[in-house]
From Swiss-Prot:
<dbReference type="InterPro" id="IPR012281">
    <property type="entry name" value="Phospholipid_synth_PlsX-like"/>
</dbReference>
<protein>
    <recommendedName>
        <fullName>Phosphate acyltransferase</fullName>
        <ecNumber>2.3.1.274</ecNumber>
    </recommendedName>
</protein>
<keyword id="KW-0594">Phospholipid biosynthesis</keyword>
<keyword id="KW-0444">Lipid biosynthesis</keyword>
<dbReference type="GO" id="GO:0043811">
    <property type="term" value="F:phosphate:acyl-[acyl carrier protein] acyltransferase activity"/>
</dbReference>
<comment type="subunit">
    <text>Homodimer. Probably interacts with PlsY.</text>
</comment>
<comment type="similarity">
    <text>Belongs to the PlsX family.</text>
</comment>
<dbReference type="GO" id="GO:0008654">
    <property type="term" value="P:phospholipid biosynthetic process"/>
</dbReference>
<dbReference type="Pfam" id="PF02504">
    <property type="entry name" value="FA_synthesis"/>
</dbReference>
<keyword id="KW-0808">Transferase</keyword>
<keyword id="KW-0963">Cytoplasm</keyword>
<dbReference type="GO" id="GO:0005737">
    <property type="term" value="C:cytoplasm"/>
</dbReference>
<comment type="function">
    <text>Catalyzes the reversible formation of acyl-phosphate (acyl-PO(4)) from acyl-[acyl-carrier-protein] (acyl-ACP). This enzyme utilizes acyl-ACP as fatty acyl donor, but not acyl-CoA.</text>
</comment>
<comment type="pathway">
    <text>Lipid metabolism; phospholipid metabolism.</text>
</comment>
<dbReference type="InterPro" id="IPR003664">
    <property type="entry name" value="FA_synthesis"/>
</dbReference>
<dbReference type="GO" id="GO:0006633">
    <property type="term" value="P:fatty acid biosynthetic process"/>
</dbReference>
<keyword id="KW-1208">Phospholipid metabolism</keyword>
Amino acid sequence: MRVAVDAMGGDNAPAVEVEGAVVAAREFGIPITLVGDTEKLRLELAKHNVQGLDIAIHHASEVVGMHDAASDAVRRKKDSSIRVAFDLVKSGEAEAVVSAGNSGATMAAGMFVLKRLKGIDRPAIAQIFPTLRGKTLVLDVGGNVDCKPIHLVQFAIMGEVYARHVIGVEQPRIGLLSNGEEDSKGNELTRETNAILKNISFDYEGYVEGRDIFNGMVDVVVCDGFVGNVVLKLSEGLAETVGKMLREEIASSLLSKLGYLFVRKAFKNFKKKVDYAEYGGAPLIGINGVAMICHGGSNVKAIKNAIHFAHEYVRKGVNQRLAEKMETEFTAYMQQFDAVKEAVAG
């Protein structure tokens, strides 16, 4: 089960991608194909001990930059590292893709090359957030900045199926992110979506606020990609800032340093819970394949974990199970959606 890594995507490519791949291959025995400029990748690999590791290189002459249009991965730069990585999955030379590059391009290439699961209009990027009660799945966190109610309803259905059959939540609670809990709150998009979700037969809790993501009030939080990406970046920035503040306070006096010795383990556990690198990346749910989208500034640990999680998804047949469930349950849910939409409109 080989994982194709877009080695040219990300802020620190290819050094971080190559080292992350080497560590993943060494720790987990995962076969990996690095996709990108052969000469540059060979130079990076030469810095590491790769003896006995199954790491191959597949040349790609182009790179989709962070500021390039997402469509470049499909139309103009057909030999880009991200496009070629998905081509390897399509041809059976790899089973999953990991990329820290342009997320829009990754999504576009995934949809164009691997296609979408049956009934899905738009795949979504799903991110797991740590909470007081465990985990909360938030989608979309950046794939679709402009959405219609049908898209948010599909995100809710995908999130419900994913939480139940992948994360293992027996009866996922679904919430729609808004600026208040009252039905009168929100905008036109959320109000119409809220009215429809209330009449679909799963555990829909209604509107939730940003704070509810972290208190574990619901298991799945639905929002458009613009709002979701703001939530994601805000969370990352807050965690980083809190960490810096704590380190400054600890270093401010001898008493603080002594006190830290007694709570050091607790701080380390807290840091691990809020470190995005622990989760590696976010799965792109809704395409006919496995893809992990990583933060552009991912470090070696994040790339390593993203490769590991992608490999585990393939090994456990997660996408096949999800596709089967989506085909049966999604169809039933969408039949309800059509009926409810007509009733709401009427």
